[in-house]
Amino acid sequence: MYDIKKWRHIFKLDPAKHISDDDLDAICMSQTDAIMIGGTDDVTEDNVIHLMSRVRRYPLPLVLEISNIESVMPGFDFYFVPTVLNSTDVVFHNGTLLEALKTYGHSIDFEEVIFEGYVVCNADSKMAKHTKANTDLTTEDLEAYAQMVNHMYRLPVMYIEYSGIYGDVSKVQAVSEHLTETQLFYGGGISSEQQATEMAAIADTIIVGDIIYKDIKKALKTVKIKESSK
């Protein structure tokens, strides 16, 4: 079993987006710690299994971040289940999890399931609109969410998601200072080695996604953060 606590860098691939064989090879051979498959729109059983089969040729951990029950399938090393803490809709707190347990509870290996305390911070993102997230958050709000995740829910991962824009470094830093047990994931808008380095100095793990489809060379440079220690 892989130890996610050691992961510093993850590439996130969207099954609804096209990626060439050459670019996929570069991503999977880049020394990233893991590949995560997940997205918001048009995530289907067919496109998830197609992307999974392409990535499975490479010897690195493969994660499915669950966005709907229909696209869940065996074959992944881990299944990340988001609970969107700042959603105003209970479905995105535990509704998807409830349906997953009703459908697959008898066969789930809970050692493979990682629960993520998600906080969505970009009001203009598809993720925020889809999950009906309240993104008008102060630093104090984020600190309270961090305490909730770390001390009360005791979730293994807290994911600060800016989805499409680069986040407020001071707010991410404030969250980090309240997490003593929970692993901090940061994702959103990382499009350069400099941004990757800046966020990797705060978060335990950075997630790099959109830039893969815009500039593969810039995406690959973000892996250089692994050369330095946090």
Curated annotation (Swiss-Prot):
Q: Which reaction does it catalyse?
A: sn-glycerol 1-phosphate + all-trans-heptaprenyl diphosphate = 3-heptaprenyl-sn-glycero-1-phosphate + diphosphate
**Cofactor(s) the protein needs:** Mg(2+)
- Recorded E.C. number(s)? 2.5.1.n9
Here the disulfide bonds are: none
UniProt enzyme class: transferase
Assigned keywords, A-Z: Lipid biosynthesis, Lipid metabolism, Magnesium, Metal-binding, Phospholipid biosynthesis, Phospholipid metabolism, Transferase
Q: One of this protein's GO BP terms? A: glycerophospholipid biosynthetic process
Give GO terms: molecular function aspect only.
heptaprenylglyceryl phosphate synthase activity; magnesium ion binding
- Which amino acids does the record list as binding sn-glycerol 1-phosphate? 12, 159-164, 189, 209-210
- The entry's Mg(2+)-binding residues are 14, 40
Question: Which InterPro entries does this UniProt record tie to the protein?
Answer: GGGP/HepGP_synthase_I, GGGP/HepGP_synthase_sf, GGGP_HepGP_synthase
Q: Does GTP-binding count among this protein's keywords?
A: no
Q: How does it assemble?
A: Homodimer.
Q: What does this protein do?
A: Prenyltransferase that catalyzes in vivo the transfer of the heptaprenyl moiety of heptaprenyl pyrophosphate (HepPP; 35 carbon atoms) to the C3 hydroxyl of sn-glycerol-1-phosphate (G1P), producing heptaprenylglyceryl phosphate (HepGP). This reaction is an ether-bond-formation step in the biosynthesis of archaea-type G1P-based membrane lipids found in Bacillales.
The entry assigns this protein to a family as follows: Belongs to the GGGP/HepGP synthase family. Group I subfamily.
| Stated name of the protein | Heptaprenylglyceryl phosphate synthase
